[in-house]
């Protein structure tokens, strides 16, 4: 297994697919990295030379990835919550942030149903 940015990427997959195993690098970023390093996207990682791997490592260092990216995202969410803007309030309450309807759906964000006892009818 090749090691790029302290992440083990699979050897038997194409370079573009293997690079997406790094948090913060998707298909487009992986294609850009391959283009800058002048490496064919269809080559398997196991077939790369050490010079090509080091070229990929140098280019990938320019991207915000892994722990730094996770920290940046969490700080952005914390900032929204501190400012108490609408998005921050939705994050705090654990509700959908991007305007989705919550009357009938949004179970993923809200969690399992909390049943409330209905009113008992008197006879």
Swiss-Prot record:
In residue numbers, the region (Disordered) covers: 94-123
Q: Which InterPro entries does the entry mention?
A: Rbsml_uS13_C (IPR027437), Ribosomal_uS13 (IPR001892), Ribosomal_uS13-like_H2TH (IPR010979), Ribosomal_uS13_bac-type (IPR019980), Ribosomal_uS13_CS (IPR018269)
Q: Has keyword RNA-binding?
A: yes
**Is Transmembrane among the key words of this record?**
no
Q: Which UniProt keywords apply?
A: Ribonucleoprotein, Ribosomal protein, RNA-binding, rRNA-binding, tRNA-binding
Q: Which domain of life is it from?
A: Bacteria
Could you tell me where the Basic residues compositional bias lies? 106-123
Q: List the disulfide bonds.
A: none
Q: One GO CC annotation, please?
A: cytosol
Q: Where is the signal peptide?
A: none
What one GO molecular function would you report for this record? rRNA binding
- Provide the function of this protein: Located at the top of the head of the 30S subunit, it contacts several helices of the 16S rRNA. In the 70S ribosome it contacts the 23S rRNA (bridge B1a) and protein L5 of the 50S subunit (bridge B1b), connecting the 2 subunits; these bridges are implicated in subunit movement. Contacts the tRNAs in the A and P-sites.
According to the record's subunit comment, the protein's assembly and interactions are: Part of the 30S ribosomal subunit. Forms a loose heterodimer with protein S19. Forms two bridges to the 50S subunit in the 70S ribosome.
What HAMAP family is this protein classified in?
Ribosomal_uS13 (MF_01315)
The UniProt similarity line reads:
Belongs to the universal ribosomal protein uS13 family.
What protein does this entry describe? Small ribosomal subunit protein uS13
Species this protein is from: Mycoplasmopsis agalactiae (strain NCTC 10123 / CIP 59.7 / PG2)
